[in-house]
């Protein structure tokens, strides 16, 4: 497996997509920390809004789904992580569990097959990567002390992003991991 980096620019974001596809083609796996990509809450230099790491995770997920490992039948091996200080951390934590809920509805109410290669799972997102939150000692200390955890902007670490009770955030990590 290869650990890859990505810079916060569209050229690098798309280069990562190409690089992952080629690595999958030749039978390898990849892992990428997406904490370098600014939050959807931040601003672009031209005044617009970025789409955030989750939007590009959708693209990377589809590449992993379509380019099988070694161009055979085995699924691509893929990991994505986000640091616990990232402003989009809650959306990252919850994204796969939300998609799993959709799959359950499709299976239970729509009559779709429950196997992983069936239509229910092929129609939802975030199924082709293991997602990991990169926690810090500071975060774990905030959990133990029952403190609020503040995120920070990617582009300006001095600027505070959203905050949550640290224990609640850790609880969501456990609940969402269990739900998948």
Report each predicted region and the residues it spans:
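Active-site cavity-forming subdomains of large catalytic enzyme subunits
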Residues: 2-180
